[in-house]
């Protein structure tokens, strides 16, 4: 019978990939400082949402503008977390543009 390992899965997403990579490095550094094994950041596919909008309010359907939003996503797994690791991750100050989802 295999031993079950305790694992924390952190899923991050943001519109700015630079901000996302900085946040990932902060999380991995914090995990390594508290003697937990961090795997990642693992890049997930970027979700691209495209919008097509008519430029004119009345006629000219041939004239359109295209906009898009790109959502960059990463996953970090932390194995063997201690109470010290969880406390350090809770105190971590991350930018407002990064959405974080934590699963135990």
From Swiss-Prot:
Any Gene Ontology CC annotation: small ribosomal subunit
Pfam name, any one: Ribosomal_S10
SMART domains per the UniProt record, alphabetical: Ribosomal_S10
GO molecular function: structural constituent of ribosome; tRNA binding
Keywords: Ribonucleoprotein, Ribosomal protein
Keyword Lyase applies: no
InterPro entries, alphabetized: Ribosomal_uS10, Ribosomal_uS10_CS, Ribosomal_uS10_dom, Ribosomal_uS10_dom_sf
An annotated GO BP: translation
Family affiliation: Belongs to the universal ribosomal protein uS10 family.
Assembly and interaction partners: Part of the 30S ribosomal subunit.
NCBIfam families named in the record: PRK00596.1, rpsJ_bact
Function: Involved in the binding of tRNA to the ribosomes.
Name of this protein: Small ribosomal subunit protein uS10
Organism: Gloeobacter violaceus (strain ATCC 29082 / PCC 7421)
